[in-house]
Amino acid sequence: MITEERLKGAYSEGEALAIYNEVKQSGDLIGFCRTFMNHEDYQVARNALWGVTKASKAEHAQLQPLLHPLIDLAMQTDNASVRRLSLYHIERLKLEEDDLRTDFLDFCLAHMVNPDEFPGIQSLCMKIAYRMCKFYPVSQGQVIDILIIGAFFNSYSLQYYSFWKGKIGFARTVPVSWTTPMSIASVTV
């Protein structure tokens, strides 16, 4: 059984995999997550969430009932690692129209263009915001516009916009040189 004490250490990839294998054998992935993901010690929460990243797609689907608690965790935590890992799990879960939360959409929109945010968090927020808006084409276009505008202020936004447009099928392009500042006239929408 995995204990709080065991999750307090600094872990390597192999140790995260060992945690996952032990949780898999116990057959209680959702219970493990529910127990440790909101732990007051960020190291414990981080290691628990990291171990669960090793789950297969089918196993990960078991976490669907934790979608909204994971969303709350992502929005409320002060720890960047816990935020990134909770966003990673959210991104792997199904998002239906009934799951759309405007507070979470606002969170994603704010963090995807925040120059002080880590690039991994920015890219996950971009992808999740785009997926949340797929039910509303006008909103989806607005997310793309925000990404384009965010590229003016943040090179990370531009890099991740270029990466994700191929992954999730953005229809718009940003013809920009990576070495010169972009002017508003150089953006095509």
Language model feature labels by segment:
Residues 1-166, 189:
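Alpha-helical scaffold domains
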Residues 172-173, 177-188:
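Low-acidity, Ser/Thr- and Arg-rich intrinsically disordered low-complexity segments
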